[in-house]
């Protein structure tokens, strides 16, 4: 009888706890409610804009959003302390890690940049490009912005190989 009472008491406590526990919820950021904003010109060459930016609250560290680059626009060199993932959604662009070749990226491509790697990305000279950028903050640091990508570097011949 005692084990049955103990089991019943545990079930009752669990049921009551579920009634008083805060409900888990999701946040939905509706496309129609989000603003398109120009990117910071101190970190980009040319015209680009950000849409649908999001940033998780601590303890989560994820942030991201859509970035649309007009033809010829690009980021400056930069480093993400915990890496960055780009999902190209439209058009064609270019990316490069320091010391590596310039590579073409197209709609459907995914670029995974490891933590601490100096790189840049942007549209091709004659074609727009849009991607979703996803990263993580490290102790309140998202990105270390560096120098502008020169035209000499940006206009290098494209290496036609896989992203890896």
Go through the PLM ranges and name each one.
Residues 1-10:
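Bacterial N-terminal signal peptides that target proteins for export
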Residues 9-18:
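Bacterial N-terminal signal peptides
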Residues 22-61, 142-164:
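A short, N-terminal "cap"/entry segment at the start of jelly-roll beta-barrel domains
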Residues 66-70, 79-95, 134-136:
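Short, conserved beta-strand element in jelly-roll/cupin
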Residues 99-116:
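Short acidic-glycine-tyrosine-enriched beta hairpin
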């Amino acid at each position: 009888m005692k084990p049955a009472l103990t089991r019943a008491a545990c079930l009752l406590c669990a049921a009551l706890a579920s009634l008083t526990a805060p409900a888990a919820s999701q946040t939905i950021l509706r496309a129609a409610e989000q603003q398109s904003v120009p990117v910071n010109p101190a970190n980009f060459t040319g015209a680009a804009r950000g849409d649908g930016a999001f940033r998780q609250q601590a303890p989560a560290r994820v942030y991201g959003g859509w970035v649309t680059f007009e033809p010829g626009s690009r980021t400056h060199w930069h480093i993400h302390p915990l890496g960055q993932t780009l999902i190209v959604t439209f058009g064609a662009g270019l990316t490069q890690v320091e010391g590596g070749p310039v590579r073409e990226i197209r709609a459907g491509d995914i670029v995974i940049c490891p933590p601490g790697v100096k790189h840049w990305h942007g549209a091709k000279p004659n074609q727009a490009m849009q991607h979703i950028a996803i990263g993580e903050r490290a102790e309140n640091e998202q990105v270390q912005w560096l120098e502008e990508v020169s035209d000499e570097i940006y206009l290098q011949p494209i290496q036609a190989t896989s992203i890896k």
